[in-house]
């Protein structure tokens, strides 16, 4: 009996020594950003996760995959090569990744943007079912999934392209009056300038008159030679811009 007790004690001591030998003290290389081993110790995150109805989607660089919540198992829906082949067959451009892909319709389709088109792809049939021409310079894009109409701005004016590809210029304002963009320098939680109704048949937008505001001499340093690009900026105590809101009924240019 005594020998058995001694054997158990010996095993406990041996395991304690082994555990102590396995302990590792962290160094600055492990703990500091930029350290040789820092990024190896970070938890791995998944970026680009979206919900496709009740299905979790991982849209990364090369593939669009579904993820099973119970076990994390992934299933490839479509690849970048397959999508670009579909786009090339219809001369709709190409995409370089799926980071900007969206899934507006539950468990049905994927929306991707090329430089020249918005494209809906049926992921089950792996075919293009709809496309919409897009101006390469279109900014502040706001797409409605019900009407498939796209509101966007070119310079300071607002345009709408309907689902059948017809484009309507909503405003024709001179320089100094901005339509369809965020106002009040994005203060008060304002981050956009167009707002679709749920059915996509009405579009509300901001109109900002800043023609009375003095120019602030901003310089664009990204050009080969720095260029002057004045910005309307009301200094303290000086005249500020005026903002109003309008609503247009699609598809006719009817203001309300």
Which residues are covered by each model-predicted region?
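Bacterial Sec-dependent N-terminal signal peptides
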Residues: 1-26
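Beta-propeller folds
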Residues: 20-256
């Amino acid at each position: 009996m005594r020998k058995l007790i001694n054997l158990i004690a010996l095993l406990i001591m041996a395991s304690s020594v082994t555990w102590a030998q396995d302990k590792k003290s962290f160094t600055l290389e492990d703990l500091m950003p930029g350290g040789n081993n820092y990024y190896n110790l970070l938890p791995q995150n998944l970026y680009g996760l979206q919900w496709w109805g009740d299905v979790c989607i991982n849209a990364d660089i090369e593939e669009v995959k579904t993820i099973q919540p119970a076990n994390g198992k992934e299933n490839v829906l479509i690849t970048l090569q397959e999508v670009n082949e579909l786009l090339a067959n219809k001369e709709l451009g190409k995409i370089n990744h799926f980071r900007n892909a969206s899934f507006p319709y539950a468990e049905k389709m994927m929306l991707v943007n090329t430089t020249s088109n918005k494209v809906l792809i049926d992921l089950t049939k792996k075919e293009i079912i709809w496309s919409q021409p897009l101006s390469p310079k279109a900014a502040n894009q706001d797409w409605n999934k019900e009407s498939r109409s796209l509101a966007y701005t070119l310079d300071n004016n607002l345009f709408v392209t309907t689902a059948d590809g017809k484009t309507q210029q909503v405003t024709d304002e001179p320089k100094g009056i901005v339509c369809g963009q965020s106002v009040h320098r994005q203060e008060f939680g304002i981050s956009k300038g167009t707002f679709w109704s749920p059915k996509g048949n009405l579009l509300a937008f901001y109109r900002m008159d800043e023609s009375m505001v003095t120019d602030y001499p901003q310089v664009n340093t990204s050009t080969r030679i720095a260029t002057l690009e004045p910005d309307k900026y009301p200094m303290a105590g000086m005249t500020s811009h005026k903002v109003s809101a309008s609503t247009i009924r699609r598809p006719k240019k009817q203001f309300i």
